[in-house]
From Swiss-Prot:
Family per record: Belongs to the RemA family.
Superkingdom assignment: Bacteria
Native species: Desulforudis audaxviator (strain MP104C)
Protein name (record): Putative regulatory protein Daud_1598
Length: 95
């Protein structure tokens, strides 16, 4: 399986293959998950002091905080996958 990388803001790169979920940080269960990840040393803060807009959960149980909207991250994820599919079909990745 090829490794796909996704930009989650400020030049921070995450392996797209390892992402399980991209969720909003607003709900209490997610906030609790962030706190628990911090306690376990599994929290990666990639917000650069900005407001957390997306919480990315990986298959290794890491919790990544991003200042990018969940939809934006998801869109990048989807367009990366589409680029992989259309790689040899003359599609230049434009919407």
């Amino acid at each position: 399986m090829e490794i796909r990388l996704i930009n989650i803001g400020f030049g921070n790169i995450v392996s797209a293959n390892r992402i399980v979920a991209i969720v909003s940080p607003e709900s209490a269960p997610i906030k609790r998950m962030i706190t628990e990840a911090r306690d376990r040393g599994m929290l990666i803060d990639a917000t650069y002091g900005r407001r957390t807009r997306a919480v990315i959960i990986t298959d290794s149980d890491h919790v990544i905080l991003s200042a990018v909207q969940p939809e934006t991250v998801a869109h990048r994820l989807v367009s990366k996958m589409e680029q992989a599919h259309h790689h040899h079909h003359g599609d230049n990745g434009k919407d």
